[in-house]
Amino acid sequence: MNLQTLLSMISNTSSWSISTAIIMVICNLLCIGLGRYAIQVRGLGPSIPALGLKGFGLPELLATTSLGHIIGAGAIIGLNSIKIIN
């Protein structure tokens, strides 16, 4: 398979815009909010004093924002494929 065939199979994705950023921020905030109450064993790693959340440390923040980025990327690709954002 040559490179031109592979490139033709890849869908055209949107460039970075303010709507893309807003979708990613919303997805991350939703996952942080859900993770705050859904994570049962928390507070085992270093805490983040700037947030002021008891028992919500660095491992929990990394886990929830990782999930937020996965959901955000899926939402951006999905909304781009049905032409809601471009």
Curated annotation (Swiss-Prot):
GO terms for cellular component: chloroplast thylakoid membrane; photosystem I. Signal peptide: none annotated. InterPro entries: PSI_centre_PsaK_sf, PSI_PsaG/PsaK, PSI_PsaK, PSI_PsaK_bact. It is found in: Plastid, Chloroplast thylakoid membrane. The chain crosses the membrane at residues 15-35, 57-77. One of its GO terms (biological process) is photosynthesis. This is Photosystem I reaction center subunit PsaK. It comes from Gracilaria tenuistipitata var. liui. The lineage of its organism: Eukaryota, Rhodophyta, Florideophyceae, Rhodymeniophycidae, Gracilariales.
